[in-house]
Amino acid sequence: MFSFYFDNKKISKLLMVGYGSTGKSVCDFLANFIDLSVDISQNDDDFINCDLEQYDLITVSPGIPLNKSPYRVLSKFKQKIVSDIDLFYQSIRNTKAKMIAVTGSNGKSTIVTMLDFVLRDMGYKSILVGNIGTPPLNKIGEKFDYCVVEVSSFQIDLFNSVEFDLGCVVNVSLDHLDRYKNYEEYKQSKLNLAKFSKDFFVYDVHNTGIKYAGEYQIVRGSIYKDTTKLLDITETNLFGEHNLENIIVVLNIFDRFGIDISKAVAAIKKFKGLKHRCEIVKNIAGVTYINDSKGTNVGATIAALNSITSSKNIILLLGGVAKGGDFSLMSKSLAKYVKYVYLYGQDKEYIENYIKDMCRYQICNDMKDAFRLASQKAQDSEIVLLSPACASFDEFSGYAERGEVFEKLVAELK
């Protein structure tokens, strides 16, 4: 066993703030070192009783709200704060492995999952970690060529010294106003990824006007490189122009690492997409049920509405924890594609204030009630879409459980 060093400084005492999956992964990793004392703050009372001056390092879980009491005091100890991703980087930085980071409001999970899938399909050893669910320190013992990291703004706010080989920001839209003062502060948090990346680009045509497409362009549902057609959306298991944009981001990343694009395109055609993201569950009596539970903000739901139909035939299940989202942005998509909205969840009245003049709707008790009413209303050739544009924590443990409940309700239909 060895002593623990961070940036060539021996660490004797460390505080772990938060003990969810990230905190546990940090503590499990640090248990391998000698001469290191680790204290754990699991709740507000624990934290209040901590003398922050005594610690060499403070590792903070991304779920800790730095903008709220009692955690605001951490801003005075910024030089001591590190993320679990910083600790991971310290352990692998002298290897040949490449680290790729992707952040954004929408699209990032699809992009990182596609990256990991294609790399593996092409024979590279790849690990997929970060905000998508697996803490990187849980993979510390594995050998890999590429480490694909989905990072949230909360994680970027905690970065200390990590250096990604490539960082990418995609599709920043209004979100998490429960953690940020305004959209500009949230967007800047995302863009701060550039400070921790050797190479960096932004692909965000919808919201900032910035779009680095390299040599790629979308023409009538197909991706071209210069004048050569690479693939059509119908050749993939995906749908919607937003997924063509996701593919362009992936191809640009591969270009920067010198990876064969023709082989990458062949692998992309096999990629089946994300669970709970515009996933067709079943067609019953002509009604198609689609699970887009991963649509946890307004931008994601707009992308879903704009991609799955060309008619006004969607019955939408909308609601949950709104996180300060601007639902007025949905006006065009609601008018064009949505026949009826069933509104539910903690912030249903908040959302109602935005959409009451945009569409026909009904307030429901909860998601199950909304589903029951939607399934009764739906007719042949219509779509019942769960795309809540909200977080799920008022009713569920996360978007995955919400999606699973939706699928179970569909399965129970006669």
Swiss-Prot record:
E.C. no: 6.3.2.9
Subcellular location: Cytoplasm
Protein name as annotated: UDP-N-acetylmuramoylalanine--D-glutamate ligase
Any GO MF annotation of the entry: UDP-N-acetylmuramoylalanine-D-glutamate ligase activity
Record's signal peptide: none
Biological source species: Francisella philomiragia subsp. philomiragia (strain ATCC 25017 / CCUG 19701 / FSC 153 / O#319-036)
Cellular component annotations (GO), alphabetically ordered: cytoplasm
Cited InterPro entries: Mur-like_cat_sf, Mur_ligase_C, Mur_ligase_C_dom_sf, Mur_ligase_cen, MurD
Functional note: Cell wall formation. Catalyzes the addition of glutamate to the nucleotide precursor UDP-N-acetylmuramoyl-L-alanine (UMA).
Positions that bind ATP: G104, S105, N106, G107, K108, S109, T110
UniProt GO BP: cell division; cell wall organization; peptidoglycan biosynthetic process; regulation of cell shape
PANTHER family membership: UDP-N-ACETYLMURAMOYLALANINE--D-GLUTAMATE LIGASE
Family: Belongs to the MurCDEF family.
Pathway assigned to this chain's UniProt record: Cell wall biogenesis; peptidoglycan biosynthesis
Lineage, broadest ranks: Bacteria, Pseudomonadati, Pseudomonadota, Gammaproteobacteria, Thiotrichales
Keywords: ATP-binding, Cell cycle, Cell division, Cell shape, Cell wall biogenesis/degradation, Cytoplasm, Ligase, Nucleotide-binding, Peptidoglycan synthesis
Disulfide links within the chain: none
Catalytic activity: UDP-N-acetyl-alpha-D-muramoyl-L-alanine + D-glutamate + ATP = UDP-N-acetyl-alpha-D-muramoyl-L-alanyl-D-glutamate + ADP + phosphate + H(+)
